[in-house]
Amino acid sequence: MITITITLGVNYLRPNSWPSHYDSVVLITSIGCKSSPTQTVGTVIGKDLIVTVAHGVAGQTSTSITTVSGQVLNAKVVAIDINLDLALIYVDSAKSTTKLLPLKFGDAVAGSETRFVAFEDSQQFAISAKIKEILRIVTEDIYLKNKISRPGLKIKTRVVVGNSGGPLINHKSEIVGLVWATSRTEKNLAWATRIEATDKLLALISSRNPQSATPQVVACSG
């Protein structure tokens, strides 16, 4: 499988139409343990909390986000799960000139159309992503050492390197999953983790003071 990056956000336009962009989806840049910066995508899911993929931030010494308006804000990893390939990042949203409103969780529906949100050349895009199947995905942890099982989604959309963490957003502007890999053998086939898997990480931190959390120390991935 090939990893990918995605972005999400919320910006309502007219009824019965998909938003042109999502303010709640941000670009994440991490540095410290690789020869070049690692970029992934994150989505605001709580006050000052962003969810993304673990393999992009694991072992890094510095992380920041870039909003759709181009503003860069410092961020901090507060929880990480190397088996689910998920991480929570804290950012002081009060400093953002863009409203970073949390997206609600939604249930994935097989056969439904969603929007996959990510970035290309620092510009956010949102494209069609159809949910083909809801399943358990047998894969490996982010270090490719141990076999694990994740609540997953098989989706049809175009994903490239750097899109990892990009959300799948339904017509209600709810997040239903995070893309983390694309197929090496079938064109426009990708894999996502269902958003309810994030509940395990959310239970580890304080909703009132998330920045106080200290995640487990993990090595660089990839």
Where are the regions that the model predicts?
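N-terminal targeting leaders that route proteins to membranes or the secretory/organellar pathways
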Residues: 1-19, 208-222
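Conserved positions in beta-strands of structured domains
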Residues: 43-45, 76-78, 132, 160
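Active-site region of chymotrypsin-like
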Residues: 21-29, 92-100, 125-208, 214-215
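Short acidic/glycine-enriched loop/turn segments that link adjacent beta-strands
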Residues: 82-85, 186, 221
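Conserved active-site neighborhood of the chymotrypsin/trypsin-like protease fold
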Residues: 37, 48-126, 208-209
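Short glycine/acidic-enriched loop and turn motifs that connect beta-strands
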Residues: 33-34, 121-122, 185
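A conserved glycine-rich beta-strand in the N-terminal activation segment of trypsin-fold
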Residues: 12-15, 25-47, 53, 71-74, ...
